[in-house]
């Protein structure tokens, strides 16, 4: 388990490129036949990926020992979105078939967590966010057909994108975790611009659907002290509450956003005018 400490905004603005990447970038999300796990002190979110290839991958009691409990979800809830081939997640003996871009919310208290791919040649890629939970809401599958896509932006400003809200109060109940998937239209490059911060939530982005020769310049920092991190395909970045989180790519891309905090109202954000950015 890779543990990332919280960092003050005054400290963050003094960091060079390598230090920024070390603090906020998660480079290796998917490793064959393993799970990856990054634990952030910021709202205690856990971020990672699971890619079963030659055999199923189980998250067992070894993780619980690192968290001071018996199992990962003794005091946590889990959200998973599959960005790879078809697969399944077995939760306490019940199999949930999870296809490409299907998602599964897994309840606090679940013990057995096994992840499998249907085909080794096209393995599932289960990306997950895990957050502290105070009560148990039912495990539930969410497919793209269950969400109401919202298209925002304009081709003229290169920010036309479709937002798919998977884990939000209108779709299912969670303790604090929200997740969704935003896809840029072909030829569009900007996400979340004009940008914002949200004092009551932190956020993590996973960028994917990127070609090998492309990248995203992820914008972060306080609005008057902006910095950037160069992102490649299937990499994630941690965004503290005080930081903007926006990006511009060399080509169109898709990203998953996950939020943890005290407020699940999607529009609870502090907008930043473009002319106020520095």
UniProtKB/Swiss-Prot annotation:
Coiled coil spans: none
Residues annotated for Zn(2+) binding in this entry: 196, 198, 203, 245
Catalytic class of the enzyme: isomerase
InterPro entries named among the record's database cross-references: KduI (IPR007045), KduI/IolB_isomerase (IPR021120), KduI_N (IPR027449), RmlC-like_jellyroll (IPR014710), RmlC_Cupin_sf (IPR011051)
UniProtKB keywords: Isomerase, Metal-binding, Zinc
Pathway the protein takes part in: Glycan metabolism; pectin degradation; 2-dehydro-3-deoxy-D-gluconate from pectin: step 4/5
GO biological process, one term: D-galacturonate catabolic process
Superkingdom classification of source: Bacteria
EC number: 5.3.1.17
CC cofactor: Zn(2+)
Catalytic activity: 5-dehydro-4-deoxy-D-glucuronate = 3-deoxy-D-glycero-2,5-hexodiulosonate
GO molecular function: 4-deoxy-L-threo-5-hexosulose-uronate ketol-isomerase activity; zinc ion binding
Cofactor note: Binds 1 zinc ion per subunit.
Function: Catalyzes the isomerization of 5-dehydro-4-deoxy-D-glucuronate to 3-deoxy-D-glycero-2,5-hexodiulosonate.
NCBIfam families in the cross-refs: PRK00924.1
Family: Belongs to the KduI family.
Protein name: 4-deoxy-L-threo-5-hexosulose-uronate ketol-isomerase
């Amino acid at each position: 388990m890779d543990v990332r400490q919280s960092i003050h905004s005054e400290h963050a603005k003094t960091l060079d490129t390598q230090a920024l990447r070390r603090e906020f970038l998660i480079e290796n999300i998917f490793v064959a036949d393993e799970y990856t796990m990054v634990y952030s002190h910021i709202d205690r979110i856990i971020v990672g990926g699971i890619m079963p290839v030659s055999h199923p991958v189980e998250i067992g009691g070894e993780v619980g020992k690192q968290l001071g409990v018996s199992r990962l979800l003794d005091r946590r809830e889990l959200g998973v979105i599959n960005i790879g081939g078809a697969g399944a997640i077995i939760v306490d003996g019940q199999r949930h078939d999870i296809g490409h871009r299907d998602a599964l919310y897994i309840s606090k208290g679940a013990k057995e967590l096994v992840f499998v791919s249907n085909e080794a040649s096209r393995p599932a890629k289960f990306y997950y966010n895990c957050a502290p939970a105070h009560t148990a809401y039912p495990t539930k599958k969410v497919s793209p057909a269950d969400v109401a896509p919202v298209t925002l932006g304009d081709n003229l400003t290169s920010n036309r994108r479709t937002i798919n809200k998977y884990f939000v109060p209108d779709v299912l109940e969670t303790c604090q975790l929200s997740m969704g998937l935003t896809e840029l239209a072909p030829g569009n490059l900007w996400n979340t611009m004009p940008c914002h911060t949200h004092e009551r939530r932190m956020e993590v982005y996973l960028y994917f659907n990127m070609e090998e020769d492309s990248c995203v310049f992820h914008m972060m920092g306080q609005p008057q002290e902006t910095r950037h991190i160069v992102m490649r395909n299937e990499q994630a970045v941690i965004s503290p509450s005080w930081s903007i989180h926006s990006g511009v790519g060399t080509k169109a891309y898709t990203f998953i956003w996950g939020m943890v905090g005290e407020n699940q109202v999607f529009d609870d954000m502090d907008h930043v005018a473009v002319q106020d950015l520095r």
